[in-house]
Amino acid sequence: MANLNQIQKEVSEILSDQKSMKADIKAILELLGSQNPIKESLETVAAKIVNDLTKLINDCPCNKEILEALGTQPKEQLIEQPKEKGKGLNLGKYSYPNYGVGNEELGSSGNPKALTWPFKAPAGWPNQF
């Protein structure tokens, strides 16, 4: 067990460390407050990064090879354009024998009691719509 003198010594060390940290925090905050706003510094850093990347891309020998290859392309198109334009897909009517549907625009299922939409209430039902 620690005696009172040892505890007092440790507490005083912690107190002095805390005071020095408080002074350090104030100094850091003053330093940060005197600098440029964060947005401006971020913009300058981003501009420098963009400039460096464009310089690397422009100086790359592979980029020059690509530009030369693109410059020597044949003037004729190698891929033929389709001759028929504006013709969509030829989709037939719904013909799967599903006896749970019966809309005319989808094709009839052949079931005379099939459900249709909008739903028509049978005779005797209250009119909800």
Curated annotation (Swiss-Prot):
What does the subunit section of this Swiss-Prot or TrEMBL entry state? Homotetramer, through coiled-coil domain. Homotrimer when bound on icosehadral capsid. Interacts with capsid protein, and with movement protein.
GO CC: one term? host cell plasmodesma
- The signal peptide stretch is none
Please give the name of this protein.
Virion-associated protein
**Which keywords accompany this UniProt record?**
Coiled coil, Disulfide bond, Host cell junction, Virion
Record's Pfam families? Cauli_DNA-bind (PF03310)
Question: Which sequence ranges form a coiled-coil region, renumbered to this chain?
Answer: 1-31, 38-59
State the residue spans of region: Capsid binding: 122-129
Q: Which InterPro entries match?
A: Caulimo_virion-assoc
Subcellular location, in the record's words? Virion; Host cell junction, Host plasmodesma
Protein family (similarity comment) = Belongs to the caulimovirus ORF III family.
Q: What is the lineage of its organism?
A: Viruses, Riboviria, Pararnavirae, Artverviricota, Revtraviricetes
By its UniProt entry, which Gene3D superfamilies does this protein fall under? Answer: 6.10.250.630
Q: Which domain of life is it from?
A: Viruses
The species this protein belongs to is Cauliflower mosaic virus (strain Strasbourg) (CaMV)
Please give the function described in this protein's UniProt entry: Plays a role in virus cell-to-cell and plant-to-plant transmission. Interacts with virion icosahedral capsid and movement protein, thereby facilitating virion cell-to-cell transmission through plasmodesmata opened by viral movement protein. Also interacts with aphid transmission factor, attaching the virion to aphid stylet when the animal feeds on an virus infected plant. Aphid saliva may later detach the virion, inducing release of infectious particles when the animal feeds on a new plant.
Named from the GO MF annotations, one term is: DNA binding
